[in-house]
Amino acid sequence: MTEIRVLIADDQALVRAGLAALLDLEPDITVVAQAADGAEAVALAGNLPVDVALLDIEMPGLTGLEATERIVAAGRETRCLMVTTFDRPGYLRRAFDAGASGFVVKDTPAAELAEAIRKVHAGLRVVDPALAEKSLLAGPNPLTPREQDVLREASHGASAGQIGRALYLSAGTVRNHLSSAIGKTGTANRTEAAAVAARNGWL
């Protein structure tokens, strides 16, 4: 039986410990390390023999998506399996764009999570069926990278001037990007546009 060495990265200590305890019950899975954020996960994956990195998509600092990009870019054999509490369809496409091998939600039963790890380790792709359906229905992210940047800043309550200073754009350019994003999301204002984009995992 091949041993699968797993790294768990989640900013919630209880979640990490719970996942580790459940996975350690599997005869072929060994949790070799735990990380509290994406940066720690990247460092551990670079220094330890890790077959599968189980990464929470939303962590402070370096996100699970960014950590996945770095782990994959390092050229190691580690495969990344994204885990999230949010079934936002846009996350699925972004995860695969980052180089992830799979995507599951956190309430996946332990036996199914273990099976997902085995499949990813074997070189297969794993996707939560409900999330895959939502992703197909939602379609691709309609926002340009710059519109995403502008909406991200707007979601924190920044004015057009403040957004412009943060992104080195003129206030007029910011307003144009906001107007375009509002149109694409079918909303009435920047607050609604940011909320819709966040809900769909486009930011």
Label every model-predicted segment.
Residues 10, 56:
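Active-site residues of response regulator receiver
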Residues 34-52:
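Acidic, metal-coordinating helix/loop segments flanking the phosphotransfer/catalytic sites
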Residues 37-40, 60-66:
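Acidic catalytic/metal-coordinating carboxylates
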Residues 43, 65-77:
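Short amphipathic alpha-helix used as the core "switch/output" element in two-component signaling
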Residues 86-87, 172:
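Short, conserved "switch-loop" micro-motifs in signal-transduction and mechanochemical regulators
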Residues 90-97, 101-149, 202:
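Short, flexible helix-to-coil linker/hinge segments that flank and couple to helix-turn-helix
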Residues 159-192:
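Recognition helix of helix-turn-helix DNA-binding domains
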